[in-house]
């Protein structure tokens, strides 16, 4: 068996045994990523309005970090929200704050996706705290 196949087999066995012996997946951090296009405002207006909300986001229970995203060339903006638990993530995505972001008339083509962090892998790449 060549080295790549051997390595792949070891990885598959490790992942399977981790799931079996750990009782499933990790219950650690949850991540929510949103994207949208802005309409009727430019980037500087968006940033000025967002600056007024930074303290509101900083006060969200369980929110460890929020990264603000911008790709001005493609008119795509958004955020990466990192939560300490699924519960805090769920509370945020069901909150009035999130509904306000999602329903903002200056944001079109809104999409939001949720992910759990794979802590068993992330701990090796500075993806956990």
Regions found by a protein language model. Give the residues of each.
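Bacterial N-terminal signal peptides that target proteins for export
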Residues: 1-9
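Short S/T/G/P-rich N-terminal loop/turn motif that feeds into the first structured element of a domain
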Residues: 5, 15-77, 86-94, 110-129
